[in-house]
């Protein structure tokens, strides 16, 4: 009886201790694969930094454009349509003249950022045409676009390796903040993960 138990333990231990013959190879093969991994990691990190710089430049340009805007009569989006959408809410009785202007600019900035993030995905896939799955990828990778996840068709998320969720994508330190507080003529920024009410 003891021999059969010992035999089973040895078999189990043998299965658990099995290591493929090439797992601990040293020399050129292992060094080459390690070097390739390091290069791929370095490229990925560098690519992420470039994307982050693009987004930071985008927001810096948007802030500068807002600060220097003097013509509030020309808009890229139709104010009448925005006002009509605002009035779709039954609780809204009256709308000031400034409200649609602010909504127009906010919508423009929303579209521009989503387009930039989708274009980044397009370039990652070495294409020159932005597709709807690029927009789906931009939405699924960005926390502030979570409210749009339910309107993305599920098949769009499966195309071109979009099974990667934002949980598996490393966050880049210094991502553009989305919470602003105007105080004494200065702009304060909080990181995307931290809200001013949480400090």
Curated annotation (Swiss-Prot):
Gene Ontology CC annotations of this record: CCAAT-binding factor complex; cytoplasm; nucleus
Tissue: Ubiquitous.
InterPro entries assigned to the protein according to its UniProt record, in alphabetical order: Histone-fold, Histone_H2A/H2B/H3, Transcr_DNA_Rep_Reg
GO molecular function: DNA-binding transcription factor activity; protein heterodimerization activity; transcription cis-regulatory region binding
GO biological process: positive regulation of DNA-templated transcription; regulation of DNA-templated transcription
Compartment(s) where it occurs, according to its Swiss-Prot or TrEMBL record: Nucleus; Cytoplasm
UniProt cross-references to CDD domains, sorted A to Z: HFD_NFYC-like
Main localization of the protein described in the UniProt heading: nucleus
Record's keyword terms, sorted: Activator, Cytoplasm, DNA-binding, Nucleus, Transcription, Transcription regulation
Xref: Gene3D superfamilies: Histone, subunit A
Similarity comment text for this entry: Belongs to the NFYC/HAP5 subunit family.
Purpose: Stimulates the transcription of various genes by recognizing and binding to a CCAAT motif in promoters.
Quaternary structure and interacting proteins, as annotated: Heterotrimeric transcription factor composed of three components, NF-YA, NF-YB and NF-YC. NF-YB and NF-YC must interact and dimerize for NF-YA association and DNA binding. Interacts with HTT1 in both cytoplasm and nucleus.
Listed name of the protein: Nuclear transcription factor Y subunit C-2
Species in which this protein is naturally found: Arabidopsis thaliana
Gene name as annotated: NFYC2
